[in-house]
Each structure stands twice: as structure tokens, then as C-alpha cells.
């Protein structure tokens, strides 16, 4: 028996030598590399198999270049062609249902005429946060806490939004301080080229930290650094893991530098939040952390639970807001004819009553400009994202099995005259489109930047619309207003509006672009 085993082993060794060694006995590859290549080949085939799988929803799929294009290639192309694929589908089907294939999932695209049908399901049968968690591998990026309860939504809706009018002076105070730290020093009449995208992130980070942590802790540099790093590491980690089969994610994730950075951010964030909670005495603090601590019940009260929610809320409130603001700054500099009318409006409001509780509500033109900029350059091309956990059949007979992910092509809709109000064609940028319509008292509230309806879902729609949109709107209007009063902005000589970068179904302002800034002086008044 031992002899037989010895012979078999010898035979296997010879076979292996023939495969690995050349005729001259020269190694073709190291044994370890053979193992790596074999594993890599298996992994590639497995990934292609996963990318080639598709949903069972029987509606047209858009994006294929030909009948011969493999599904895995279409999913990869969606990363950089997502915007055009969605637009192609909307233009072709418009009022009927279609689907797109992206990395990790298929998305059934619902036109607005079906919205009332699909939004009727109760929250236990549909989750609007789940698509975000899935896209960014929430199990590894610590996003699963949002699936456990809606503590953060309760705090925003019940505590933050009712307090917004009293927060204007608080936010302005922190913005004034932030400008001294984040705008570079410059001489009178000196134009300085700046990275406006990064500046916006830092300005919004500081304002948000004031609202999130209160005046005593908002300038904690560890927290400010963490919130900036966390978003970047989460995005990179989630994007990479999206193409990795679930069975391999526990092994691949620890190898990613971004994942290790993310874990460090989470650990640091827990420490900061824990220290603040332990240092707080009694009630009366007017900040999100205090409200969240007071509203938490059961497991929500755990420091780790609260800290993770604070990190994700910071991600949502800072980076989408900063990108929207960067888009608006690019639009403003590309269309300088809007600068003086907007500045005059801000001056008129402030001269009349200062930054009182109603100041931001009276900036009608500024509100309109931000809404029009968002119409052209939304951060998200698809909104009303949700996953259904109950099978349903729509009025046209389309069956959506349990587990179906749906979304609305909000950006494509906002390029369609059927969904864009006013006499100016939707293909033309009209910064005062909405303020002109709102001059009619019948539409005074309908076309606010923060308002949503079935034609404009940039912030979502209905009870699942972004709960923080009213805060974000005020933050953006305040920031743009102060910048207009204190600075001049323009594009570098010979440059046009920076082109947007579309990644998957997101529209990102070019982070490489620069703007020129100059302090305004008394003679500019």
C-alpha cells in the first residue's frame, strides 16, 4: 500500500513537472504563482458568472450595443456610461417600464405615472435605505445600522426640521469662522486660484459639525478629519466590493487599504462620540447628537450605534451638499450675468432685517438658481430607490417579484418639457425659472428648492423623500449668499464650465477644476 502510494506520488510529481517545467527543465513559473493564476482564473470566471446573471422581471433591458454583447460587459460599461444608458431608456420608453443592469444588481426604472402605485406599500415591505446599503457593501462599511431602525430619520424630522429657523444665526456664525480657515489669504484685488470642490467639503463639514455636535465640540479636528476620510474610504471600499462575489468579500475586504482606513475612521469616530456623550451633563443641548441620544431606545442607546449613525449622517449631509454647491458655483461662474442680481437680492434681504429667522425664506432668486442648477446637475441620476420585499403586480400587468429594486429616472425627467415648468425650454438654463413662477401666489410654495413632487424627485418623493432636504437647502442658500457678499468668483481665463463626471448613476462635479476668487472691498459695493 505504501509502495503504491509512493508510485502514485512519483507519477503525480512527473506530471506536475511536465506542466510546470519546459523541455529543458527550466521553470516556467513558480509553484506559488501557479496557484495564484489558478485562483485568479477561477475568480474571474466566477465574477463573470455573477455579472452575467440577471433579474426575472419581464421588462425591456436598455444599454446593449448588440445581441452579442455579454451581460457582464454591459454592467461594466454602466460604470462610465450610466447616464447615457438611462437617458436612452427614458427617451425610448418614457411612460413605460424598463430596466438597466449595473454592477451588483438590476434596477427596474419606473416612470412617474406608476409612482402612486409603488409608493403605497408599507415600510416593512419596502426599504428606501437598503439600495444605498447594498451599493456600498454595508456589511463591511458599517451601514447595516440604518436597517435596524430609523432613529436618524426621527431625529431629523421631529427635532432638526422644526428648529431650522432658529439655526440660521448658528450656522452663519460657524460659516464665518470656517471662511477664515478655509479660504486662502489674499491681498486686495488679488485673484487666487482655488480648489472650490475641496473648499466646499470643508465649509459644509464645519457647518454640519456645529449642528451635529454643538458649539463646544464642533471644531474637534479628529472628528472633522474622520468625516472627510470616512466618505472617501466608504465609497472606494463599496465600489470595489460591488464586483466581488459575496462569498469572497470576507477575504477580500481586509486586503483593501480603503477598508482599513474605514475601520480606523469608525474606531476614531466612536471614541470622539463616546467622549462627547460622557462629557454632556443634563439636557438642553441643541444639536443632533443630543437629540439622538435623547430619542434613542433599546439598542439605539449604545454608543457604537449612535456613533455609526452620526458618521453616515455626516457622509450624507456633507458630500451630497458640497457637490451640489460645487455644481452651483460652476454654473454661476459660467453664467456671470446672474451674479449681480443674486448679490443684490441677498443685500436687500440682509439690509432690511439682517439674518433673522425669515431671511433665507426671502431669497427667492437664490433658491431658484440652486433648483435650476440641480435640475441640470443632480448628484443622483436615479432617485426614489427602494427594494421591495413583497411581490406586486402593476396596473400594466408587470410583475415585480420580491427582491426587485426600483428607481425613478429623475434627471432624464427633468430634461423633458412634460416635467419642467415655465416658458423657457428645458434644454436652456434659466436660473430664475422657478422664482418667476413663484411670483404667482398659487405657486408660492410648490417650486421651492426643497420641495418635491411627481415631476421633480431630485430629493425623492412622498414620505420617503430625503428627510434632511430642508436643512440642506438652508445650508446651501446661506453658504452661497455669504460667498456672494464677501467674494468675487470667476472661471480661469479661457476656461468654460467644467464638465461633469458620471460614475455609475452619480453625477460628480469635476474635482480637478479650479475657480478664481477675490475678496470684495468697500468700493465693490
Curated annotation (Swiss-Prot):
Pfam families: p450 (PF00067). Disulfide bonds: none annotated. Keywords: Heme, Iron, Membrane, Metal-binding, Monooxygenase, NADP, Oxidoreductase, Transmembrane, Transmembrane helix. Its EC number is 1.14.14.86. It comes from Gibberella intermedia (Bulb rot disease fungus). Its main location: membrane. Pathway: Plant hormone biosynthesis; gibberellin biosynthesis. One of its GO terms (molecular function) is heme binding. The lineage of its organism: Eukaryota, Fungi, Dikarya, Ascomycota, Pezizomycotina. This is Ent-kaurene oxidase. Catalyzes three successive oxidations of the 4-methyl group of ent-kaurene giving kaurenoic acid, a key step in gibberellin (GA) biosynthesis.
Amino acid at each position: 500500500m505504501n509502495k503504491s502510494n509512493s508510485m502514485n506520488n512519483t507519477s503525480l510529481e512527473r506530471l506536475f513537472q511536465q506542466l510546470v517545467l519546459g523541455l529543458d527543465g527550466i521553470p516556467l513559473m513558480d509553484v506559488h504563482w501557479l496557484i495564484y493564476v489558478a485562483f485568479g482564473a477561477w475568480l474571474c470566471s466566477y465574477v463573470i458568472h455573477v455579472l452575467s446573471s440577471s433579474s426575472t422581471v419581464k421588462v425591456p433591458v436598455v444599454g446593449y450595443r448588440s445581441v452579442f454583447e455579454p451581460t457582464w460587459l454591459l454592467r461594466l460599461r454602466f460604470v462610465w456610461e450610466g447616464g447615457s444608458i438611462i437617458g436612452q431608456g427614458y427617451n425610448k420608453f418614457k411612460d413605460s417600464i424598463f430596466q438597466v443592469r449595473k454592477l451588483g444588481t438590476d434596477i427596474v426604472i419606473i416612470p412617474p405615472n406608476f409612482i402612486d402605485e409603488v409608493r403605497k406599500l408599507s415600510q416593512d415591505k419596502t426599504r428606501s435605505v437598503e439600495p444605498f446599503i447594498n451599493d456600498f457593501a454595508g456589511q463591511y462599511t458599517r451601514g447595516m445600522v440604518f436597517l435596524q431602525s430609523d432613529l436618524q430619520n426621527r431625529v431629523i424630522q421631529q427635532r432638526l426640521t422644526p428648529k431650522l429657523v432658529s439655526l440660521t444665526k448658528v450656522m452663519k456664525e460657524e460659516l464665518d469662522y470656517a471662511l477664515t480657515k478655509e479660504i486662502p489669504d489674499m491681498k486686495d484685488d488679488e485673484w487666487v486660484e482655488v480648489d472650490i470642490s475641496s473648499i466646499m467639503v470643508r465649509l459644509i463639514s464645519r457647518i454640519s459639525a456645529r449642528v451635529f455636535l454643538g458649539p463646544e465640540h464642533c471644531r474637534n479636528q479628529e472628528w472633522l478629519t474622520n468625516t472627510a476620510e470616512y466618505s472617501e474610504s466608504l465609497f472606494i471600499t463599496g465600489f470595489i466590493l460591488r464586483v466581488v462575489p459575496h462569498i469572497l468579500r470576507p477575504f477580500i475586504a481586509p486586503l483593501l487599504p480603503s477598508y482599513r482606513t474605514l475601520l480606523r475612521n469608525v474606531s476614531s469616530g466612536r471614541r470622539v462620540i463616546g467622549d462627547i456623550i460622557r462629557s454632556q451633563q443634563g439636557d438642553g443641548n441643541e444639536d443632533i447628537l443630543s437629540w439622538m441620544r435623547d430619542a434613542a431606545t433599546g439598542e439605539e442607546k449604545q454608543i457604537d450605534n449612535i456613533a455609526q449613525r452620526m458618521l453616515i449622517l455626516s457622509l450624507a449631509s456633507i458630500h451630497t451638499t458640497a457637490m451640489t454647491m460645487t455644481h452651483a458655483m460652476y454654473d454661476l461662474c459660467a453664467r456671470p450675468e446672474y451674479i449681480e442680481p443674486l448679490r443684490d437680492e441677498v443685500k436687500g434681504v440682509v439690509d432690511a432685517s439682517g439674518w433673522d429667522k425669515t431671511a433665507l425664506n426671502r431669497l427667492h432668486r437664490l433658491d431658484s438658481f440652486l433648483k435650476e442648477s440641480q435640475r441640470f446637475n443632480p448628484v443622483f441620476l436615479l432617485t426614489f430607490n427602494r427594494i421591495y420585499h413583497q411581490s406586486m403586480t402593476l396596473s400594466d400587468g408587470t410583475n415585480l417579484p420580491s427582491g426587485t429594486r426600483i428607481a425613478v429616472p429623475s434627471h432624464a425627467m427633468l430634461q423633458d418639457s412634460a416635467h419642467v415648468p415655465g416658458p423657457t425650454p428645458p434644454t436652456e438654463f434659466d436660473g430664475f425659472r422657478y422664482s418667476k413662477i413663484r411670483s404667482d401666489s398659487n405657486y408660492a410654495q410648490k417650486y421651492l428648492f426643497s420641495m418635491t413632487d411627481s415631476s421633480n424627485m431630485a430629493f425623492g418623493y412622498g414620505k420617503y423623500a430625503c428627510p434632511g432636504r430642508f436643512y440642506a437647502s438652508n445650508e446651501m442658500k446661506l453658504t452661497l449668499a455669504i460667498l456672494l457678499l464677501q467674494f468675487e468668483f470667476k472661471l480661469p481665463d479661457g476656461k468654460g464650465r467644467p464638465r461633469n463626471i458620471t460614475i455609475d448613476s452619480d453625477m460628480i462635479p469635476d474635482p480637478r477644476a479650479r475657480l478664481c476668487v477675490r475678496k470684495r472691498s468697500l468700493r465693490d459695493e
